[in-house]
Amino acid sequence: MEDCCDPLLATDASPRPESFSRSEKDIASRSRTVAMADLDSNCELSNDVDMEQSSPDLMKLEQSSDPVALDGKVVLGFSLASPDLVNCGASPDLPRGSYEDSPEFSKKRRFSTELSLENGIDGSTTTTRLGRKSQVVKFSAICQTFGYELSPESSFELPSPPGDFRESMTPVISINSGSISTDVTVEDVTFLKDEFFSGGESITTDAVVGNEDEILLYQTARLGNFAYKFQSLDPGDYFIDLHFAEIEFTKGPPGVISGLDLFSQVGANTPLVIEDLRMLVGREGELSIRLEGVTGAAILCGISIRKETTATYVEETGMLAVKGSTDTVLSQQTQENLVCRAEEEAEGMRSDCEQQRKEMEDMKRMVEELKLENQQKTRECEEALNSLSEIQNELMRKSMHVGSLAFAVEGQVKEKSRWFSSLRDLTRKLKIMKVEQIKLLEEATTYKHLVQDINEFSSHIQSRVKQDAELHENLKVKFVAGEKERKELYNKILELKGNIRVFCRCRPLNFEETEAGVSMGIDVESTKNGEVIVMSNGFPKKSFKFDSVFGPNASQADVFEDTAPFATSVIDGYNVCIFAYGQTGTGKTFTMEGTQHDRGVNYRTLENLFRIIKAREHRYNYEISVSVLEVYNEQIRDLLVPASQSASAPKRFEIRQLSEGNHHVPGLVEAPVKSIEEVWDVLKTGSNARAVGKTTANEHSSRSHCIHCVMVKGENLLNGECTKSKLWLVDLAGSERVAKTEVQGERLKETQNINKSLSALGDVIFALANKSSHIPFRNSKLTHLLQDSLGGDSKTLMFVQISPNENDQSETLCSLNFASRVRGIELGPAKKQLDNTELLKYKQMVEKWKQDMKGKDEQIRKMEETMYGLEAKIKERDTKNKTLQDKVKELESQLLVERKLARQHVDTKIAEQQTKQQTEDENNTSKRPPLTNILLGSASKEMVNLTRPSLLESTTSYDLAPLPSGVPKYNDLSEKENNPEMADQVHLPNKTGRFSICAKRIPSAPAPRRSSLAPTTSTSREMVYLTRPPLSESTTSYDLPPLPNGGLKYSDLIEKVNNQEMAEQVQIPKRIGAGRSSICAKRIPPAPRRKSFAPMPFIPITSTLTSPDEKSGANQVLCTSPKLHRSNGKTLTSILRRSIQKRMQMKPSPRQQPMRRGGGINVGMERVRLSIGNRGRLAHRVLLTNARKAGLKETPQKQERWI
């Protein structure tokens, strides 16, 4: 059956078809079509309803409107009172179409009973068609049942039964539809729980429906398309009561159900009972009731079945007799007449239908022709309309042209009138101007008098302007100072918070993790307090504290709010580095770059940078350039180089250190920018060229470390200060585990390099946290680039990105531990990066001077080498001098031995000479002039040895002999040592500097300079000892033997000096003069100690050389030299001093340092006293330098030697 949109409730109560055979006179059903009229379309005719053949008697009965008697029996009447039996197809609420019964109805040709309920529910109205023995009860539109058109008055109506009709019925079974619990009794009828059904569903309600006895019956119902089937029933007539109540909306629009609409009839929650539906059950004993919802759903609360006790079958006559208050007998003959008549009417209707079909085809053909003609006329109308529009356009253009010409003419006329009026105005203005000129001349004279006042006022204004200018300068200076203080305080605040600030951000769970039901590994509530708590199995595991913590719900604006102050630091001249760290897939690139509609830290920081520059444009001048690079597989790549150029000839970039100490990558493309749009285009170009790949952990994984460098050069227009700072925006690649990501090939190499660089970064952070002396910045290109940022001269911000997935808990803990170490680093205050261009020039000049100094140092080095050669020569000379000194000491020791031998021979001679000298002195006393009172030298400095005992027992004082004529005067003093010509001249001796306790000074005669150390026979070098008493009266002189090669050793000399007994036997002479030794051929033994402080007389001493005169002892010459007297008086003092010096040399000093490497004498910075020439004359003091390198150690104790 086709879908029917007519909202009808169909109820089918049909018994099972019987198996008995039919007679030859059974009614044959034929199908006919019902034409449905519509305003827009025609419904084709179809065979829709089976029409039974009726007998002539039934045809007659059909023409009557009331039930009449036929052959003495009462038959069914026909009523034309129901207009709803006609289907109006033009309803706008219902779709149009054709309707026909189900195929089962046509095939089985069962008998059916149609009941129309359009006239109300007061009386049962049925339409009966006889045929087979199965009956059908349906509530449907008549157009669905009958195959021919019926007039509005045509319907079937059953007469009302008499009052005692229900009393003759016997209840069979009653069902409470939808009830599953207990039975319900209503008006002595017991309704059983719901049974014998198929389909539908049970519904219940708590609403009160009906009276108190019917509440339980109508509170349950069966809804939908369902059927009830009752078996094992006795053949006969049955009456069915159907109980309805719409306790639930049945999805059917109210008021449009044709047939049975409960809501429109009685409303909701109100019972509706359809009673006395008659049904004939055959011998099979089956009865079925089917309810279908045509529109919406069918609903039924209860079924009650009763049996009529008076209905019987008259099988003998072949008649069906229904006995009750009215008997109805339908004969087979009447039925045959009805069938014949129905066939005739069907044939007529077929011919009419065929004729109408032909007419319809003619009408269609005519309609097609009219359509073609209409199209042709339409085209002609369109062409005419187009031509008309063109003509109208042309007419409009012409009219506009004419209007423009008229407007131009009118304008020219108005222009001419304007010129005339303006001429009249000019004439009038000329007269007025003449009058005004006169007035202006008068005013000019007045203004001349006002000029002086204006000049005075202008001078006052200028002075005020000058004061304001000074005030402006003061304010300018204060403003600069305040601005500087603001910067310092602002940066101090950031420094107090820490040079490396650490922000933590947790991404939200993605769609896949949410679908999989992954648990949260981070406590979201803790992020509001700046703390991150890692959860494990729902319990806190470890907590971390950072400067700022952003949860999964934090926006990009919230993240940038704490990052904004770093843009101000960049403008103020400080280096700033912002980088993101974390495992792959945690949102590092999203935080740094973001999307087009949700920008990240990079874009917002640069936007804030240009906003500050805009606000300071009247006080500062800034230049900004941008470069983008990446570290891919430990290689630096410039992302701003075109792809074609980078692919053809890839350039290797290296990191260089500038003279200021900063690190730079030469050769990078630096793009100058003027606005945030240009900056973003450059950064976008670099980001597009970045190496990105797909892994199992992240679909868009960064395979390199991306670094954006923004260089800012600023100049203060007020004080001329220049700054040069850098902003580093670093997006690190995510750390990955090879076992987790399952990468291979090139991806494996990338992962290894990424992990290597991040491991190097971890080593640097560990070394900085432990304040190690060596920081391994050069282990990776990444750490080498970040050396300036992590080294302490910049302000650094780190974003640590973590995942809330509990499966990533190990990576999250690693990232948080790393961030905690970074937060604990103390780098010290950041330094302001000044642009010292002039300083660089000076440094270049210094470098040039350094090069020149290197050349001079080379020359100095050559000179030092020369000096080293000279030092070597000096050492060699010193070695020779030392050798000579050793020889001199050996000779002196030999002299001591010779003196011992010679002293025994001269004692007698000395005694004789002393006796003679005393005699001569007594004789010559009266002849000598008195000595002068003026001493030649200071008496306090000229000492005569008073420890020597007197030779004579008498205390007689002796007068000193007068000076010989050959003695020079005191004022003839000159430099005999430096002038060779004066070497042979005689002059007074210099002051000896020795203390003398003698009463009178004994002058000494000068001796001529010696040019050799060889022994001389001159009497001027002879030594006479006057303090020793004579051993004998002999005056014989002895010649000293020459010194043998194996003379007295130096050790023997020391032994003699230290031995007092040997000192008395052998007298050691003192060096003559200031440290000079006199080497004579002959020596006179010293005199014995004096026992008196009386002055010694002059004793003439003869030569000690072996001569005939000496041997005879005659003609001895007296020695009157002052030099001889002085040497005799100081012999003992010299001996004692020399003995003390020898002992000091024998005892090593505890503080004496070892000799310098290389040996030799000490030739350091020492003062050396040189004595050249006569005894007692001090030479010039010369400062000698050793010219040794400063690296050599000097002896702590300086030594002095007298040569």
UniProtKB/Swiss-Prot annotation:
GO terms for cellular component: microtubule. One of its GO terms (molecular function) is microtubule binding. One of its GO terms (biological process) is microtubule-based movement. ATP binds at residues 582-589. Residues 336-395, 846-901 form a coiled coil. Residues 499-825 form the Kinesin motor domain. It comes from the Eukaryota. Residues 19-28 have a biased composition (Basic and acidic residues). The keyword Nucleotide-binding applies. Keywords: ATP-binding, Coiled coil, Microtubule, Motor protein, Nucleotide-binding. Pfam families: Kinesin, Malectin. Residues 1-28, 907-931 are annotated as: Disordered. Belongs to the TRAFAC class myosin-kinesin ATPase superfamily. Kinesin family. KIN-14 subfamily. This is Kinesin-like protein KIN-14Q. It comes from Arabidopsis thaliana. The gene is KIN14Q.
